[in-house]
């Protein structure tokens, strides 16, 4: 089953809507410059009300490992998504205490061999590339490149996904998971609950149509 991560969660209503629709992973953005940044206390409150089987992912951009660990102690997220320019050493230091999803902003010029340098990372999130921005741009990632990466790595496809294109993205890439934020919003940080359900329904429909028999139940970052 393809994992579905709804990112940019800032309030309990959106978190509940995502879970009710079938999402199994929620992203909480702690990057101070993000339009979807969540207040730490709000993230902790939302996390406390999530079912145990729903994964909470803390999203960071160039944060210090010590700061990530301190925030984790308060919010109790299950995995860290590193969405900046973090080195393999930084990723390994974070991965020593919790599972890491390393994000890359990719276009046709991205070298897939870069992924091999991050040996301790649980999964890679491939996002659309736009100069000077760390995600949430709505820019589509290079699906062909992502497809190649997915043959040898756990790939979470992100960047420009929405109801209208997620089925085709899954057909092309066959990813471990999909990630969406801006594609389901009425405004930054507020989800359209109707579109959210449509998106998740499209993912599950695509799985059935393609006959995907992927079982990632043993590959949840909560229990790597």
Q: Where does each model-flagged region fall?
A:
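Conserved N-terminal beta1-alpha1 strand-loop-helix module at the mouth
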Residues: 1-224
